[in-house]
Curated annotation (Swiss-Prot):
This is Ethanolamine ammonia-lyase small subunit. NCBIfam families: PRK05465.1. PANTHER family: ETHANOLAMINE AMMONIA-LYASE LIGHT CHAIN, ETHANOLAMINE AMMONIA-LYASE SMALL SUBUNIT. Binds between the large and small subunits. It is an enzyme of class 4 (lyase). It comes from Pseudomonas fluorescens (strain Pf0-1). The gene is eutC. Pathway: Amine and polyamine degradation; ethanolamine degradation.
Amino acid sequence: MEKPPVDPQNPWLELRRLTPARIALGRTGTSLPTRAQLDFQYAHAQARDAVHLPFDHAALSAQLNERQRESLLLHSAAVDRNSYLQRPDLGRKLSDQSAQTLREYAQAHPGGVDLVIVVADGLSALAVHRHTLPFLTRLEEQMSADEWSTAPVVLVEQGRVAIGDEIGQLLGAKMVVMLIGERPGLSSPDSLGLYFTYNPKVGLTDAYRNCISNVRLEGLSYGMAAHRLLYLMREACRRQLSGVNLKDEAQVQTLESEAGTDMKSNFLLDPPPA
């Protein structure tokens, strides 16, 4: 089926067809059309709902158990959602009880582990509910050849990114991978973020972490996200570092190969007409 011709009077319509971004909305007088205004309000409501949606850790734990994956439930020092939103520092550290739980687990399982995966609600529990299991499935498939010892999956209520460093340190983990709901956008209320740290410990800054963002069906695919993360993990083990000194070369190779095989599908890469 042929694509409809581009309206020469409004070339923005062709770009609008290729992106969920709010472009080419039209106008009614000096204002937005009613449809565009209602869509904006609906997207804003979705983003707010995603921020305040409670983390259904019980359902996620049950699904992990069905896949023979043990899990631990912990809580940050933020006692509730309001505290979490108003005091970001409390979301970066464990509650006293949760820290003690991890110490007891580490004493019962001495020797440390290579990898601990932490799942936190962050600013979008919706992202965690939708994407955690599909992503972990692809990650486990691709890392089956790597003989890394793993801790139980750690589920954290009211958690922020840096809390993974404390968890990794208490468990004696060589690597920590944090899966966390990202701040909702007006076109993406369910983006999952991945944060990787080698040799985690309390006090590390973002410079020591690698981030893979926008993991969702309309963004970065589960398989590609797992591929990029595994590249970082293997390189981190080889070079014994992470963060700004560890570049994601896997991304460059993938983009180059896609550009060579699928150039015609990308309007930005199409050659100009003769």
